[in-house]
Amino acid sequence: MEDKKFAKERFIDGFLGGVEDWDNHLAEAINKDENPYLKDKLLKILKEQEDFGNAINSGLGREMWYSNDFFINSLILDFITGAEDDLVNELKQIWVGMLGKPGVNVEAINMNDEFEGYLIKMHFEMELNIHLISDLVAYYVYGMQISSERERVKLFPEMAELLLYLIDKKALLKKATEVAQNDQENQEDHNSPRLNIASELYEAGMKFVLGHEIGHHFLKHTESTGRNIVSKFVPADVTSNQLHLDEFAADNFALDLLISGMKERNDNNLLAPLIVLLMLAIYDKTPEEPNQSHPSFRDRYLNLLSRVSEHDEKVASGLQQIFNNVATWINYSLSESGYWKTEWWK
């Protein structure tokens, strides 16, 4: 009997634009003569990844086992390190493929008997948007630590610029081109409190998104026969729609996976899943309404907030206040009369 191919081969062979090493692919695609700044920056990133891999993976450098994206591979390794014994072997069957396609999309691919492993595909725009919303919210959270109102007000133009990039990728491309042409570097201190907040939100946001898709696989939502809805992941009295229940269960699985990996209390890790939903809601004019396959963003947000409240009610209350304030600011920044028809987060 012929050995089955693994999910990695399924991705590279089956998806247009699928490559074995995403970061190296980006670096090789840039002509140094045409864009020396970007070329040097991408090569620097590869070198930093090599050094990081040598430090944490016994000198194995950029060796990747669970994704074609170095950062995502590192996140899966984190999951494995912090997982209960019964999850470790399952997590080692995950493979995440990054694609350079437009669209805020990540998907657990249905199982195929011809291949081993669990395949997840992610579009680059999803990771980019998690980065942008993390930066945006980090300005607000950092501002909460500043006593001077005048200094806090200075942060809003930065937030407005990031919001523009979330809704207008042409504006982001224009900015990136200007930076490349002028060899501009971000002068913000890499050890600044705001950047630390943004980094924590970004990492936890990515873990939540990956954990959600891993949940779809582990709860058997991607299999053609049988389901394995673990009752603790299904919220009570929410809906009888099976597809909606799948989404709630995957959200809860992802949050539990995130919390189980926390070595110490970190409120930003718990805020991150909420702001991922806020980012996705920007592309939905009616976040209070469900569609055929997904519950409303309002219900998903309130479900996660309830789960955080079970973990720590005081923390949940603080995160709710942050979410309310940022969502309100986004709503009226995008339109004086309100971007969304309702204040769905309240």
State where each predicted segment sits.
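Amphipathic alpha-helical segments that form well-ordered structural scaffolds
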Residues: D78-G82, A249, F253, L257
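Peri-catalytic and regulatory segments of divalent metal-dependent proteins
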Residues: G17-K207, L219-T222
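Acidic, metal/cofactor-coordinating or nucleic-acid-engaging core segments within structured domains
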Residues: D189-S192, N196, E200, V209, ...
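Post-HEXXH active-site segment of zinc metalloproteases
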Residues: L219-F248
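Glycine-rich loops and low-complexity Gly/Arg-rich segments
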Residues: Q145-E149, V234-P235, Y301-L305
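Catalytic Zn2+-binding segment of zinc metalloproteases
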Residues: M206, G211-I229, D256-M262
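Long, well-structured alpha-helical subdomains associated
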Residues: A7-G18, W22, I30-N31, Y37, ...
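Long, charge-dense tracts
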Residues: M1-K5
